[in-house]
Amino acid sequence: MPTPSSALGVRAVRAFTDNYIWLIEAPENRLIAVDPGEAAPVRAELERSGASLAAILLTHHHPDHIGGVAELLAAGPVRVVGPADSRIPMAIETVGEGDRCEFPDLGLGFDILHVPGHTLSHIAFFGHGALFCGDTLFSAGCGRMFEGTPKQMWTSLSRLRDLPPETLMYCGHEYTAANLRFALTAEPANTATSEYRDRVARLRAADQPSLPSPLSLERRVNPFLRCEVPGVRQAAAAHAGRPLQGDDEVFGTLRAWKDQFR
């Protein structure tokens, strides 16, 4: 059964081994699916709750985020909104930086942020106190840079970090526990991070999601949002074995370090 979460009315539906498909609740028992990589979990929740699918939001083109769209559309046409990217094989309504995605009949609307780095066309949806950011920002971590540069990714993460602190962040994967192991390696004296690690361990032991996470917490525990903090800069420079200059270079060093971290 999906796990309900607060703010906006959002349900977490699990997919594959660690993906989350977020279902945004709308009036008249309608749901908006965010990044449905699989159709079956969404269909199961629609059947369980008697809800109907009102729309689909896509953050990027990776198969584990769009793989269920065609099957869901086979049950009936719904509005699909996502980035302009030829690797998304179905016809969708494309949006980009500065656009606003409105659902007047649902009383919902989201601002579109272009956040390149994980992929070049990656977008995020921000509205109603919630941020749906796909694989750009994770709790205590961030996505790998499959296409973008460290400067692009750092700029994207900085934009998300600077959204209102009470914003709840809904990302695409349950990576929090593993991310916290790295965060405490990069910043071992951060008591907020160690406290969060213990809380996440309890949640996961109870088979509960660690998400959503407020940006106010991410600013305190996520090393990839803290590249200007002296302790994080020093740890990155020590790992690189040389002085580092700008925050984007600190970020790039941290990301490369995390890529090899076990």
Question: Which residues fall in each region the model found?
Answer:
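Core dinuclear metal-dependent hydrolase active-site scaffold
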Residues: T3, L23-E25, R100-F126, L131, ...
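Active-site HxH/HxHxD metal-binding segment of metal-dependent hydrolases
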Residues: F16, R30-L31, E38-L113, E195, ...
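Divalent metal-coordination and catalytic microenvironments
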Residues: I24, D35, H60, L72, ...
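Conserved beta-strand hairpin/beta-sheet module of binuclear metal-dependent hydrolase folds
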Residues: P2-S52, I123-L137
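Active-site-adjacent loop/tail segments of enzyme domains
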Residues: G141-T167
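Active-site metal-binding loops of divalent metal-dependent hydrolases
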Residues: P36-E38, H61, D85-S86, H118-T119, ...
